[in-house]
Amino acid sequence: MISTLGIVWGSTFLFIELALQGITPLWLTSARIVFATVITSMIWLMRGGRLFTTNETAWTRLGIIGIISTALPFQLISWGQQYVTSSFAGLAMASMPLFVMPLAYFFNTNEALDRRKFIGLLIGFLGIIILFSPDFTQGNDTSILTTLGKLACILAAFCYATNSILMRKLPSIDPVGLAAMSLLIGSFWVVLWAVTIEGPPPIISAETLLI
């Protein structure tokens, strides 16, 4: 199960890289998130369509989660992969735990930050700096775009880390409903950004559509 999940998760970045050859990043993100919204919402409705399982609600927090769990990271990854490889994008996602620990400590989620964990964090962030170091020594336009692409992927990982902390503070909620609502909120913003920035959706080839 874990190996299958790893293959599916890792191959996502390869498919994004291939799809970007035939569609702009904002509309690629829109297509991905709208498709996922439709499928997840259908499953949620078949399960009864209930969201909060108690009288306690948290709509504002859910709205924020919808943005930082889908809209922002999906967009950042698609934009960043114009300038970085799919392997780097996948590697950048592995930095998420580095952000979770200090965020958990900052938001007082009973996450202790002892010396051993602190040293581990320093080593992890040193690794991120090493990933960026080749770009710092060049300074041309290509390296600047590459650096920005890498930064976008790292920021996407930061969004996922922040989302994992915020979800801990949600009241009792149906997990499928949470996924559906997050995607629905995210799809609204992503499509709005795509129309505003890139204009009407482009005509894409059959090969890109299959990807």
Give a label for each model feature:
Residues 1-30, 79, 139-169, 183-192, ...:
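Glycine-/small-residue-enriched transmembrane alpha-helix faces in small-molecule transporters
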Residues 3-4, 30, 59-64, 91, ...:
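Hydrophobic alpha-helical transmembrane segments
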Residues 7-16, 41-93, 129-130, 202, ...:
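Specific transmembrane alpha-helical segments of multi-pass solute transporters/efflux pumps
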Residues 20-72, 97-104, 158-163, 179-198:
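Transmembrane alpha-helices of multi-pass small-molecule transport proteins
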Residues 24-25, 85, 112, 174-175:
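A helix-boundary/kink motif common to multi-pass secondary transporters
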Residues 40, 95, 103, 115-135, ...:
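Hydrophobic transmembrane alpha-helices of multi-pass small-molecule transport proteins
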Residues 72-79, 127-138, 186-201:
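Hydrophobic alpha-helical transmembrane segments in multi-pass integral membrane proteins
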